[in-house]
Amino acid sequence: MKKAGLLFLVMIVIAVVAAGIGYWKLTGEESDTLRNIVLEECLPNQQQNQNPSPCAEVKPNAGYVVLKDLNGPLQYLLMPTYRINGTESPLLTDPSTPNFFWLAWQARDFMSKKYGQLVPDRAVSLAINSRTGRTQNHFHIHISCIRPDVREQLDNNLANISSRWLPLPGGLRGHEYLARRVTESELVQRSPFIMLAEEVPEAREHMGSYGLAMVRQSDNSFVLLATQRNLLTLNRASAEEIQDHQCEILR
């Protein structure tokens, strides 16, 4: 019993330290880097000079920009042209807010242009991290390659993923995930953030604790993946963990 109690105490301490590290990472000036790039560089340059640089694309009327990330040869970020911190923002469950996941999926073409040939849809993944799983305080969806092992696991579970949010057998990367199948027409009409908030019990009240990802399946449907922060299992809900920014899947 004493050993069990000590182990539990150690886990609590680790969780608290992890939470503290996550908070520290989000309180420094560097956490505003992406926001400053969008609001002080990309957007003004597009409006004044019709040049999106340093972004790859700026769409003021649609409310988003696309930026080449420095990490990895093909990774891009889709971000709003206005202030949204992250998954905790109530704006994301407002139907009038742009459907950023659908927009990010359209922006996958930047990967192919950079690569010099078509990057197949099965190799592409989208991900956004939770409040404690991110390093930046400006909403950004990672557009990048999927890890080969995650691709294989999702392929093997194709028949087990339904149109309801259900636990993905075995989870991913050692963490629990909910999975939901969506069609392209569904995705066009409803944001994954709204699906999560309306369909998973108590999710609306804790949206900031979720990381969310999206991958295309072999039957042309999409699978949405949601993981919730659980510091006792050292899960900071960094959905980006399903991605491989070096794109081994293309080799």
Curated annotation (Swiss-Prot):
Its EC number is 3.6.1.26. It is a single-pass membrane protein. Keywords: Cell inner membrane, Cell membrane, Hydrolase, Lipid biosynthesis, Lipid metabolism, Membrane, Phospholipid biosynthesis, Phospholipid metabolism, Transmembrane, Transmembrane helix. It holds the Pfam family CDH. Its main location: membrane. It is an enzyme of class 3 (hydrolase). GO terms for biological process: CDP-diacylglycerol catabolic process; phospholipid biosynthetic process. GO terms for molecular function: CDP-diacylglycerol diphosphatase activity. It catalyses: a CDP-1,2-diacyl-sn-glycerol + H2O = a 1,2-diacyl-sn-glycero-3-phosphate + CMP + 2 H(+). Pathway: Phospholipid metabolism; CDP-diacylglycerol degradation; phosphatidate from CDP-diacylglycerol: step 1/1. GO terms for cellular component: plasma membrane. InterPro entries: CDP-diacylglyc_Pase (IPR003763), CDP-diacylglyc_Pase_proteobac (IPR015993), HIT-like_sf (IPR036265). Gene3D superfamilies: HIT family - CDH-like (3.30.428.30). The keyword Hydrolase applies. It is found in: Cell inner membrane. The chain crosses the membrane at residues 4-24. The keyword Hydrolase applies. Belongs to the Cdh family. This is CDP-diacylglycerol pyrophosphatase. The gene is cdh.
